[in-house]
Regions:
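A glycine-rich beta-to-alpha transition motif near the start of alpha/beta enzyme domains, typified by
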Residues: 1-113
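Secondary-structure transition/turn motif
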Residues: 62-64, 120-123
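Short, solvent-exposed secondary-structure boundary/capping segments
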Residues: 111-122
Length: 123
């Protein structure tokens, strides 16, 4: 099984982002904690990209202790940039436990370039 995953940084917060739009990945809390461990891959949060019929994607955020959180602005911006590149669209809607978040890519560059700008309307 191939897993599409990314390690990204947004204003000092780092994330492991897993594309789970095919819904084939189901990690346990212990597995999430292990991925977030700085002695393994390491990140502030693990983010799952999942399918959503009313938005470009649904995001699930997990903190390094394995607990799920509602949303994260920096993580949302990272995922929005990935999906923007994929869909060639500067305006992205992402569903989260905290509600729908709209992201606008301000300066569109290749998402693998470390320099890009976006904003997220959090509420």
């Amino acid at each position: 099984m191939d897993i599409k995953a990314f390690k990204m940084d947004g204003l000092g917060n780092d994330f492991v982002i897993i594309d789970n739009r095919e819904k084939i990945i189901n990690l346990t809390k212990d597995q999430i904690v292990k991925i977030c461990d700085r002695n393994f891959i390491g990140c502030d949060q693990l983010i799952f990209i999942e399918p959503d019929s009313s938005a470009d994607a649904n995001l699930r955020f997990f903190n390094s202790d394995g607990g799920e959180s509602g949303a994260c602005g920096n993580g949302t911006r990272c995922v929005a940039n990935l999906i923007s590149n994929e869909k060639n669209n500067k305006s992205i809607i992402l569903n989260t436990l905290s509600g729908k978040l709209k992201s606008e890519i301000l300066e569109k560059k290749n998402c693998y370039n470390r320099n890009w700008e976006s904003k997220v309307k959090m509420g």
